[in-house]
Amino acid sequence: MKSSTRTKIGQKVRKIRSKNAGPFWLTLDIFCVDVENFNYIHNQLKTNKVANLFQIHESKIKRFDIPDLNVIKLSFPRPRIQGKANDTDMHGASYAALLEELEIN
């Protein structure tokens, strides 16, 4: 029986950063170590898993794979408009920590 080892994406990349992309959108940047690492993450990171993690529909996620920079960008609508009374993450910084915990093969 083949065992599958799962690891967290944050352990496999140089850095994951999340930030506002205006008051209505968030962007996550995944900085890979090199081209080999980029190709691995590109193949392992499924957009539907990210959608499930953040509890949004997959069609709402805009994904940009940028091999020349070894970067993957994910953008999606904020769950709340930035600065509204119920906004608990004004700068969108907590999303990186959540994505770092996502398990991949």
Segments (PLM) and residue ranges:
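Long, contiguous binding/interaction regions
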Residues: 2-105
